[in-house]
Protein backbone atom coordinates (compact mmCIF):
# COMPACT_ATOMS: atom_id res chain seq x y z
CA UNK A 1 0.00 0.00 0.00
CA UNK A 2 2.81 2.40 0.92
CA UNK A 3 4.47 1.60 -2.42
CA UNK A 4 1.28 2.60 -4.35
CA UNK A 5 0.96 5.89 -2.46
CA UNK A 6 4.61 6.68 -3.07
CA UNK A 7 4.27 5.93 -6.80
CA UNK A 8 1.22 8.23 -7.08
CA UNK A 9 2.99 11.09 -5.33
CA UNK A 10 6.00 10.67 -7.61
CA UNK A 11 3.80 10.90 -10.72
CA UNK A 12 2.07 14.02 -9.39
CA UNK A 13 5.44 15.65 -8.67
CA UNK A 14 6.55 14.90 -12.22
CA UNK A 15 3.45 16.55 -13.70
CA UNK A 16 3.84 19.65 -11.53
CA UNK A 17 7.47 20.01 -12.58
CA UNK A 18 6.53 20.23 -16.28
CA UNK A 19 6.23 23.76 -17.90
CA UNK A 20 2.66 25.12 -18.26
CA UNK A 21 1.46 25.42 -21.86
CA UNK A 22 -1.73 27.51 -22.38
CA UNK A 23 -4.47 25.97 -24.50
CA UNK A 24 -4.27 28.92 -26.90
CA UNK A 25 -0.66 28.18 -27.84
CA UNK A 26 -0.03 25.81 -30.72
CA UNK A 27 1.22 22.36 -29.80
CA UNK A 28 4.28 23.21 -31.86
CA UNK A 29 4.94 26.41 -29.90
CA UNK A 30 5.64 27.29 -26.30
CA UNK A 31 4.51 30.44 -24.52
CA UNK A 32 7.87 32.02 -25.28
CA UNK A 33 8.50 30.92 -28.85
CA UNK A 34 6.85 30.51 -32.27
CA UNK A 35 8.22 28.07 -34.78
CA UNK A 36 8.59 29.40 -38.30
CA UNK A 37 6.89 26.55 -40.13
CA UNK A 38 4.04 25.83 -42.52
CA UNK A 39 1.54 25.35 -39.70
CA UNK A 40 2.07 28.77 -38.14
CA UNK A 41 2.78 30.62 -41.42
CA UNK A 42 1.11 28.66 -44.25
CA UNK A 43 1.83 31.22 -46.99
CA UNK A 44 5.28 30.48 -48.36
CA UNK A 45 6.10 34.08 -49.26
CA UNK A 46 4.96 35.46 -45.93
CA UNK A 47 6.90 32.70 -44.19
CA UNK A 48 9.98 33.72 -46.16
CA UNK A 49 9.55 37.29 -44.90
CA UNK A 50 9.14 36.09 -41.30
CA UNK A 51 12.37 34.11 -41.51
CA UNK A 52 14.20 37.41 -41.93
CA UNK A 53 12.91 38.42 -38.49
CA UNK A 54 14.63 35.40 -36.91
CA UNK A 55 17.76 37.17 -35.72
CA UNK A 56 19.65 34.04 -34.63
CA UNK A 57 18.39 31.92 -37.56
CA UNK A 58 17.26 29.05 -35.33
CA UNK A 59 13.86 28.69 -37.01
CA UNK A 60 12.06 30.00 -33.95
CA UNK A 61 10.80 33.45 -33.02
CA UNK A 62 11.50 34.20 -29.38
CA UNK A 63 9.54 36.65 -27.22
CA UNK A 64 12.33 39.17 -27.70
CA UNK A 65 12.32 38.77 -31.47
CA UNK A 66 8.52 39.08 -31.61
CA UNK A 67 8.46 42.15 -29.36
CA UNK A 68 11.02 43.84 -31.62
CA UNK A 69 8.65 43.74 -34.60
CA UNK A 70 6.58 46.93 -34.65
CA UNK A 71 6.52 47.55 -38.40
CA UNK A 72 5.81 45.00 -41.14
CA UNK A 73 5.88 45.85 -44.85
CA UNK A 74 4.99 42.94 -47.12
CA UNK A 75 3.39 44.95 -49.91
CA UNK A 76 3.48 43.62 -53.47
CA UNK A 77 4.76 40.13 -52.60
CA UNK A 78 1.86 38.04 -54.04
CA UNK A 79 0.88 36.87 -50.56
CA UNK A 80 -2.51 35.14 -50.31
CA UNK A 81 -2.65 34.65 -46.52
CA UNK A 82 -1.29 36.55 -43.53
CA UNK A 83 -2.06 33.81 -41.05
CA UNK A 84 0.56 34.13 -38.35
CA UNK A 85 0.28 37.91 -38.17
CA UNK A 86 -1.51 37.39 -34.83
CA UNK A 87 1.78 36.47 -33.14
CA UNK A 88 3.15 39.99 -33.67
CA UNK A 89 1.34 41.63 -30.79
CA UNK A 90 3.70 44.65 -30.70
CA UNK A 91 2.84 45.60 -34.28
CA UNK A 92 1.93 49.26 -34.80
CA UNK A 93 2.29 49.57 -38.60
CA UNK A 94 1.25 46.99 -41.21
CA UNK A 95 1.66 47.53 -44.95
CA UNK A 96 0.28 44.60 -46.92
CA UNK A 97 -1.15 46.32 -49.97
CA UNK A 98 -1.06 44.94 -53.52
CA UNK A 99 -1.23 41.26 -52.62
CA UNK A 100 -3.84 38.53 -53.09
CA UNK A 101 -5.45 38.58 -49.65
CA UNK A 102 -9.14 37.66 -49.40
CA UNK A 103 -9.48 38.10 -45.62
CA UNK A 104 -7.53 39.77 -42.86
CA UNK A 105 -8.00 39.23 -39.11
CA UNK A 106 -6.05 41.65 -36.93
CA UNK A 107 -7.95 41.07 -33.71
CA UNK A 108 -4.76 40.14 -31.82
CA UNK A 109 -2.75 43.14 -33.04
CA UNK A 110 -4.19 45.50 -30.47
CA UNK A 111 -1.41 48.10 -30.70
CA UNK A 112 -1.90 48.65 -34.43
CA UNK A 113 -2.01 52.33 -35.41
CA UNK A 114 -1.59 52.24 -39.19
CA UNK A 115 -2.94 49.69 -41.67
CA UNK A 116 -2.52 49.83 -45.43
CA UNK A 117 -4.18 46.82 -47.03
CA UNK A 118 -5.45 48.35 -50.25
CA UNK A 119 -5.49 46.68 -53.68
CA UNK A 120 -6.11 43.14 -52.51
CA UNK A 121 -9.18 40.94 -52.90
CA UNK A 122 -10.49 41.39 -49.37
CA UNK A 123 -14.09 40.45 -48.69
CA UNK A 124 -13.69 40.72 -44.90
CA UNK A 125 -11.56 42.86 -42.61
CA UNK A 126 -11.52 42.55 -38.82
CA UNK A 127 -10.15 45.60 -37.01
CA UNK A 128 -12.63 45.60 -34.13
CA UNK A 129 -9.96 45.15 -31.45
CA UNK A 130 -7.58 47.70 -32.95
CA UNK A 131 -8.72 50.63 -30.83
CA UNK A 132 -5.46 52.54 -31.40
CA UNK A 133 -5.91 52.55 -35.18
CA UNK A 134 -5.39 56.03 -36.64
CA UNK A 135 -4.87 55.34 -40.35
CA UNK A 136 -6.79 52.79 -42.41
CA UNK A 137 -6.33 52.46 -46.17
CA UNK A 138 -8.44 49.54 -47.38
CA UNK A 139 -9.52 50.85 -50.78
CA UNK A 140 -9.73 48.87 -54.01
CA UNK A 141 -10.96 45.65 -52.46
CA UNK A 142 -14.28 43.76 -52.42
CA UNK A 143 -15.54 44.73 -48.98
CA UNK A 144 -19.31 44.80 -48.53
CA UNK A 145 -19.18 45.94 -44.89
CA UNK A 146 -16.76 47.66 -42.55
CA UNK A 147 -17.13 47.74 -38.76
CA UNK A 148 -15.38 50.79 -37.31
CA UNK A 149 -17.39 51.30 -34.14
CA UNK A 150 -14.46 50.53 -31.84
CA UNK A 151 -11.90 52.53 -33.82
CA UNK A 152 -12.55 55.80 -32.02
CA UNK A 153 -9.02 57.12 -32.67
CA UNK A 154 -9.32 56.81 -36.44
CA UNK A 155 -8.11 59.97 -38.22
CA UNK A 156 -7.75 58.87 -41.85
CA UNK A 157 -10.02 56.45 -43.68
CA UNK A 158 -9.75 55.51 -47.35
CA UNK A 159 -12.25 52.80 -48.24
CA UNK A 160 -13.09 53.80 -51.79
CA UNK A 161 -13.61 51.35 -54.65
CA UNK A 162 -15.27 48.64 -52.61
CA UNK A 163 -18.85 47.36 -52.55
CA UNK A 164 -20.03 49.12 -49.40
CA UNK A 165 -23.76 49.81 -49.20
CA UNK A 166 -23.51 51.54 -45.82
CA UNK A 167 -20.81 53.15 -43.71
CA UNK A 168 -21.24 53.94 -40.03
CA UNK A 169 -18.71 56.49 -38.78
CA UNK A 170 -20.78 57.76 -35.89
CA UNK A 171 -18.10 56.79 -33.36
CA UNK A 172 -15.20 58.16 -35.41
CA UNK A 173 -15.39 61.66 -33.98
CA UNK A 174 -11.75 62.60 -34.63
CA UNK A 175 -11.84 61.55 -38.29
CA UNK A 176 -10.16 64.20 -40.45
CA UNK A 177 -10.02 62.55 -43.88
CA UNK A 178 -12.68 60.32 -45.45
CA UNK A 179 -12.36 58.92 -48.96
CA UNK A 180 -15.31 56.62 -49.63
CA UNK A 181 -16.01 57.21 -53.31
CA UNK A 182 -16.98 54.53 -55.84
CA UNK A 183 -19.08 52.42 -53.51
CA UNK A 184 -22.84 51.82 -53.37
CA UNK A 185 -23.71 54.18 -50.52
CA UNK A 186 -27.27 55.54 -50.49
CA UNK A 187 -26.73 57.67 -47.39
CA UNK A 188 -23.80 59.04 -45.40
CA UNK A 189 -24.01 60.55 -41.92
CA UNK A 190 -20.96 62.66 -41.11
CA UNK A 191 -22.61 64.75 -38.39
CA UNK A 192 -20.49 63.24 -35.57
CA UNK A 193 -17.21 63.61 -37.46
CA UNK A 194 -16.86 67.28 -36.60
CA UNK A 195 -13.08 67.29 -37.17
CA UNK A 196 -13.52 66.31 -40.82
CA UNK A 197 -11.36 68.34 -43.20
CA UNK A 198 -11.54 66.31 -46.41
CA UNK A 199 -14.60 64.42 -47.64
CA UNK A 200 -14.55 62.59 -50.97
CA UNK A 201 -17.76 60.62 -51.51
CA UNK A 202 -18.21 60.79 -55.28
CA UNK A 203 -19.77 58.11 -57.48
CA UNK A 204 -22.21 56.69 -54.98
CA UNK A 205 -26.01 56.86 -54.83
CA UNK A 206 -26.41 59.68 -52.33
CA UNK A 207 -29.58 61.78 -52.61
CA UNK A 208 -28.63 64.19 -49.84
CA UNK A 209 -25.57 65.23 -47.86
CA UNK A 210 -25.67 67.18 -44.59
CA UNK A 211 -22.31 68.82 -43.83
CA UNK A 212 -23.64 71.56 -41.57
CA UNK A 213 -21.70 70.22 -38.56
CA UNK A 214 -18.42 69.88 -40.46
CA UNK A 215 -17.21 73.44 -40.04
CA UNK A 216 -13.54 72.46 -40.42
CA UNK A 217 -14.15 71.08 -43.91
CA UNK A 218 -11.87 72.59 -46.56
CA UNK A 219 -12.39 70.05 -49.35
CA UNK A 220 -15.67 68.48 -50.49
CA UNK A 221 -15.78 66.18 -53.48
CA UNK A 222 -19.21 64.65 -54.13
CA UNK A 223 -19.70 64.29 -57.94
CA UNK A 224 -21.67 61.49 -59.54
CA UNK A 225 -24.46 61.21 -56.98
CA UNK A 226 -28.14 62.19 -57.01
CA UNK A 227 -27.91 65.16 -54.67
CA UNK A 228 -30.61 67.79 -55.23
CA UNK A 229 -29.80 70.23 -52.42
CA UNK A 230 -26.35 71.12 -51.09
CA UNK A 231 -26.05 73.60 -48.22
CA UNK A 232 -22.48 74.81 -47.65
CA UNK A 233 -23.36 77.95 -45.70
CA UNK A 234 -21.75 76.65 -42.48
CA UNK A 235 -18.56 75.57 -44.23
CA UNK A 236 -16.70 78.86 -44.18
CA UNK A 237 -13.30 77.15 -44.45
CA UNK A 238 -14.25 75.45 -47.71
CA UNK A 239 -11.59 75.98 -50.38
CA UNK A 240 -12.38 73.19 -52.86
CA UNK A 241 -15.93 72.28 -53.85
CA UNK A 242 -16.54 69.63 -56.50
CA UNK A 243 -20.23 68.77 -56.82
CA UNK A 244 -20.57 68.05 -60.54
CA UNK A 245 -22.92 65.48 -62.10
CA UNK A 246 -25.68 65.71 -59.53
CA UNK A 247 -29.20 67.16 -59.66
CA UNK A 248 -28.52 70.43 -57.85
CA UNK A 249 -30.84 73.27 -58.88
CA UNK A 250 -29.41 76.02 -56.65
CA UNK A 251 -26.40 76.60 -54.46
CA UNK A 252 -25.60 79.52 -52.16
CA UNK A 253 -21.91 80.38 -51.87
CA UNK A 254 -22.08 83.75 -50.15
CA UNK A 255 -20.43 82.50 -46.94
CA UNK A 256 -17.61 80.63 -48.70
CA UNK A 257 -15.28 83.59 -49.14
CA UNK A 258 -12.07 81.50 -49.21
CA UNK A 259 -13.33 79.20 -51.97
CA UNK A 260 -10.62 78.86 -54.62
CA UNK A 261 -11.90 76.03 -56.83
CA UNK A 262 -15.52 75.38 -57.83
CA UNK A 263 -16.61 72.55 -60.11
CA UNK A 264 -20.37 72.26 -60.55
CA UNK A 265 -20.69 70.87 -64.09
CA UNK A 266 -23.74 68.91 -65.23
CA UNK A 267 -26.37 69.99 -62.74
CA UNK A 268 -29.69 71.83 -63.05
CA UNK A 269 -28.40 75.27 -62.11
CA UNK A 270 -30.03 78.29 -63.74
CA UNK A 271 -28.00 80.91 -61.88
CA UNK A 272 -24.77 81.14 -59.92
CA UNK A 273 -23.81 84.01 -57.64
CA UNK A 274 -20.04 84.05 -57.07
CA UNK A 275 -19.74 87.76 -56.40
CA UNK A 276 -18.37 87.19 -52.86
CA UNK A 277 -16.00 84.40 -53.86
CA UNK A 278 -13.14 86.75 -54.67
CA UNK A 279 -10.47 84.09 -53.98
CA UNK A 280 -11.79 81.90 -56.79
CA UNK A 281 -9.11 80.83 -59.30
CA UNK A 282 -10.93 77.98 -61.03
CA UNK A 283 -14.54 77.79 -62.21
CA UNK A 284 -16.07 74.87 -64.08
CA UNK A 285 -19.82 75.17 -64.57
CA UNK A 286 -20.47 73.49 -67.92
CA UNK A 287 -23.66 71.59 -68.66
CA UNK A 288 -26.12 73.73 -66.72
CA UNK A 289 -28.83 76.20 -67.75
CA UNK A 290 -27.14 79.55 -67.27
CA UNK A 291 -28.22 82.42 -69.48
CA UNK A 292 -25.56 84.65 -67.97
CA UNK A 293 -22.74 84.50 -65.46
CA UNK A 294 -21.14 87.44 -63.69
CA UNK A 295 -17.40 87.04 -63.02
CA UNK A 296 -16.61 90.73 -62.65
CA UNK A 297 -15.65 90.38 -58.96
CA UNK A 298 -13.51 87.30 -59.55
CA UNK A 299 -10.29 88.97 -60.64
CA UNK A 300 -8.12 86.01 -59.55
CA UNK A 301 -9.83 83.59 -61.93
CA UNK A 302 -7.31 81.71 -64.07
CA UNK A 303 -9.53 78.99 -65.52
CA UNK A 304 -13.15 79.19 -66.71
CA UNK A 305 -15.09 76.35 -68.30
CA UNK A 306 -18.72 77.19 -69.03
CA UNK A 307 -19.53 75.04 -72.08
CA UNK A 308 -23.02 73.72 -72.85
CA UNK A 309 -25.09 76.50 -71.31
CA UNK A 310 -27.37 79.26 -72.65
CA UNK A 311 -24.96 82.16 -72.17
CA UNK A 312 -25.46 84.96 -74.72
CA UNK A 313 -22.70 87.31 -73.53
CA UNK A 314 -19.61 86.99 -71.37
CA UNK A 315 -17.92 90.05 -69.88
CA UNK A 316 -14.28 89.27 -69.06
CA UNK A 317 -12.99 92.83 -69.00
CA UNK A 318 -11.85 92.58 -65.36
CA UNK A 319 -10.43 89.06 -65.50
CA UNK A 320 -6.84 89.98 -66.27
CA UNK A 321 -5.45 86.80 -64.65
CA UNK A 322 -7.51 84.51 -66.90
CA UNK A 323 -5.30 82.12 -68.91
CA UNK A 324 -7.66 79.28 -69.89
CA UNK A 325 -11.17 79.68 -71.29
CA UNK A 326 -13.57 77.11 -72.69
CA UNK A 327 -17.02 78.42 -73.59
CA UNK A 328 -18.21 76.27 -76.51
CA UNK A 329 -21.83 75.30 -77.12
CA UNK A 330 -23.32 78.60 -76.01
CA UNK A 331 -25.40 81.10 -78.03
CA UNK A 332 -22.55 83.60 -77.89
CA UNK A 333 -22.23 86.04 -80.77
CA UNK A 334 -18.93 87.67 -79.84
CA UNK A 335 -16.11 87.47 -77.34
CA UNK A 336 -13.69 90.13 -76.11
CA UNK A 337 -10.55 88.73 -74.49
CA UNK A 338 -8.36 91.77 -74.96
CA UNK A 339 -8.09 92.46 -71.21
CA UNK A 340 -7.32 88.84 -70.28
CA UNK A 341 -4.15 86.73 -70.35
CA UNK A 342 -5.83 83.89 -72.23
CA UNK A 343 -3.35 81.58 -73.96
CA UNK A 344 -5.61 78.53 -74.23
CA UNK A 345 -8.98 79.16 -75.87
CA UNK A 346 -11.80 76.81 -76.83
CA UNK A 347 -14.60 79.02 -78.12
CA UNK A 348 -15.94 77.38 -81.27
CA UNK A 349 -19.66 78.23 -81.55
CA UNK A 350 -20.51 76.47 -84.80
CA UNK A 351 -22.95 73.93 -83.34
CA UNK A 352 -26.52 74.41 -84.60
CA UNK A 353 -28.11 73.09 -81.42
CA UNK A 354 -26.49 75.80 -79.28
CA UNK A 355 -26.18 78.61 -81.84
CA UNK A 356 -27.65 82.05 -81.22
CA UNK A 357 -31.08 82.47 -82.79
CA UNK A 358 -31.34 85.85 -84.45
CA UNK A 359 -34.98 86.90 -84.71
CA UNK A 360 -35.49 88.37 -88.16
CA UNK A 361 -38.10 91.09 -88.47
CA UNK A 362 -39.00 92.41 -91.90
CA UNK A 363 -36.18 90.37 -93.39
CA UNK A 364 -33.36 92.13 -91.52
CA UNK A 365 -31.36 91.94 -88.27
CA UNK A 366 -29.52 94.77 -86.50
CA UNK A 367 -26.14 93.59 -85.11
CA UNK A 368 -25.96 96.61 -82.79
CA UNK A 369 -28.64 94.97 -80.64
CA UNK A 370 -26.13 92.27 -79.65
CA UNK A 371 -24.34 92.95 -76.37
CA UNK A 372 -20.65 93.76 -76.93
CA UNK A 373 -20.73 93.04 -80.66
CA UNK A 374 -18.26 95.03 -82.76
CA UNK A 375 -18.99 94.56 -86.44
CA UNK A 376 -15.46 95.70 -87.34
CA UNK A 377 -14.08 92.56 -85.64
CA UNK A 378 -16.30 90.22 -87.67
CA UNK A 379 -15.25 88.78 -91.03
CA UNK A 380 -15.81 85.93 -93.47
CA UNK A 381 -19.60 86.18 -93.31
CA UNK A 382 -21.67 83.51 -95.05
CA UNK A 383 -25.35 83.49 -96.04
CA UNK A 384 -25.90 87.23 -95.45
CA UNK A 385 -25.66 90.60 -97.12
CA UNK A 386 -23.96 93.08 -94.80
CA UNK A 387 -24.77 96.79 -94.77
CA UNK A 388 -23.13 98.49 -91.79
CA UNK A 389 -24.70 96.85 -88.73
CA UNK A 390 -27.62 95.43 -90.71
CA UNK A 391 -27.59 91.91 -92.12
CA UNK A 392 -30.07 90.49 -94.59
CA UNK A 393 -30.28 86.70 -94.58
CA UNK A 394 -29.95 85.04 -97.98
CA UNK A 395 -31.26 81.54 -97.20
CA UNK A 396 -33.28 80.82 -94.04
CA UNK A 397 -32.63 77.08 -94.37
CA UNK A 398 -28.91 77.60 -93.79
CA UNK A 399 -27.08 79.05 -90.77
CA UNK A 400 -25.17 82.33 -90.78
CA UNK A 401 -21.46 81.93 -89.97
CA UNK A 402 -18.60 84.36 -89.43
CA UNK A 403 -15.18 84.76 -87.80
CA UNK A 404 -14.60 87.09 -84.87
CA UNK A 405 -11.38 88.60 -83.54
CA UNK A 406 -11.43 88.03 -79.76
CA UNK A 407 -8.20 89.90 -79.12
CA UNK A 408 -6.52 86.60 -78.27
CA UNK A 409 -7.21 84.77 -81.49
CA UNK A 410 -9.93 84.22 -84.07
CA UNK A 411 -13.04 82.26 -83.07
CA UNK A 412 -15.84 80.86 -85.25
CA UNK A 413 -19.46 81.78 -84.59
CA UNK A 414 -22.85 80.80 -85.94
CA UNK A 415 -26.33 82.30 -85.97
CA UNK A 416 -29.59 80.61 -86.82
CA UNK A 417 -31.93 83.03 -88.57
CA UNK A 418 -35.39 82.62 -87.06
CA UNK A 419 -38.51 84.36 -88.31
CA UNK A 420 -40.40 86.45 -85.78
CA UNK A 421 -43.48 84.42 -84.86
CA UNK A 422 -41.85 81.01 -85.38
CA UNK A 423 -42.56 79.94 -81.79
CA UNK A 424 -42.15 76.20 -82.35
CA UNK A 425 -38.95 76.70 -84.39
CA UNK A 426 -40.08 74.64 -87.36
CA UNK A 427 -38.84 77.23 -89.85
CA UNK A 428 -42.18 78.82 -90.72
CA UNK A 429 -44.94 80.94 -89.20
CA UNK A 430 -48.44 79.42 -89.17
CA UNK A 431 -51.43 78.69 -86.92
CA UNK A 432 -49.44 75.99 -85.11
CA UNK A 433 -47.28 78.73 -83.62
CA UNK A 434 -50.39 80.42 -82.19
CA UNK A 435 -51.50 77.13 -80.67
CA UNK A 436 -48.02 76.42 -79.31
CA UNK A 437 -47.83 79.80 -77.57
CA UNK A 438 -51.28 79.25 -76.05
CA UNK A 439 -50.35 75.78 -74.75
CA UNK A 440 -47.08 76.94 -73.21
CA UNK A 441 -48.74 79.91 -71.51
CA UNK A 442 -51.56 77.72 -70.18
CA UNK A 443 -48.98 75.30 -68.75
CA UNK A 444 -47.13 78.14 -67.02
CA UNK A 445 -44.11 77.69 -69.27
CA UNK A 446 -44.10 81.04 -70.98
CA UNK A 447 -40.52 81.63 -69.86
CA UNK A 448 -39.44 78.62 -71.93
CA UNK A 449 -40.67 80.09 -75.19
CA UNK A 450 -37.93 81.25 -77.61
CA UNK A 451 -37.34 84.92 -78.39
CA UNK A 452 -38.95 84.39 -81.78
CA UNK A 453 -42.32 83.92 -80.04
CA UNK A 454 -42.25 87.65 -79.27
CA UNK A 455 -43.93 88.52 -82.56
CA UNK A 456 -44.85 92.10 -81.71
CA UNK A 457 -41.34 92.89 -80.42
CA UNK A 458 -42.38 94.29 -77.03
CA UNK A 459 -39.78 92.21 -75.13
CA UNK A 460 -42.18 89.65 -73.68
CA UNK A 461 -44.30 86.76 -74.85
CA UNK A 462 -48.01 86.63 -74.04
CA UNK A 463 -51.40 86.08 -75.64
CA UNK A 464 -51.02 89.32 -77.58
CA UNK A 465 -48.26 87.68 -79.63
CA UNK A 466 -50.52 84.77 -80.52
CA UNK A 467 -53.22 87.26 -81.52
CA UNK A 468 -50.75 89.30 -83.57
CA UNK A 469 -49.60 86.18 -85.43
CA UNK A 470 -53.23 85.27 -86.14
CA UNK A 471 -53.91 88.74 -87.55
CA UNK A 472 -50.74 88.57 -89.65
CA UNK A 473 -51.74 85.20 -91.10
CA UNK A 474 -55.27 86.39 -91.81
CA UNK A 475 -53.99 89.51 -93.57
CA UNK A 476 -51.58 87.51 -95.72
CA UNK A 477 -54.29 85.01 -96.58
CA UNK A 478 -56.62 87.85 -97.64
CA UNK A 479 -53.91 89.48 -99.76
CA UNK A 480 -53.14 86.18 -101.43
Language model features: what each stretch is:
Residues 2-93, 192-194, 257, 341-343, ...:
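N-terminal capping/linker segments that flank leucine-rich repeat
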Residues 418-480:
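Cellulosome-associated attachment modules in secreted, modular CAZymes
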Amino acid sequence: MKKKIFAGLSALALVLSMPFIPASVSAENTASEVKINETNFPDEKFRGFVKKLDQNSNGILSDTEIAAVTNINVSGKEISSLKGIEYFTSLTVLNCYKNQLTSLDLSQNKLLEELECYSNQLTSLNVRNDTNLKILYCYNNQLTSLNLRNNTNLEQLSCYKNQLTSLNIGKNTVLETLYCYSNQLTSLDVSQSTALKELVCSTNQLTSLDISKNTALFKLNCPGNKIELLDVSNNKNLQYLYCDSNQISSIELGENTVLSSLVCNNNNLTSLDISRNTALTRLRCSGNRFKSIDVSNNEKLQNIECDYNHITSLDLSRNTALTNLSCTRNPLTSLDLSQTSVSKLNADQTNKEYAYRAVIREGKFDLSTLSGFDVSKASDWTNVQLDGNIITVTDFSEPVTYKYDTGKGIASFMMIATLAGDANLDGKVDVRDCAYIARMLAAGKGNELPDSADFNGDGKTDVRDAAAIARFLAKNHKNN
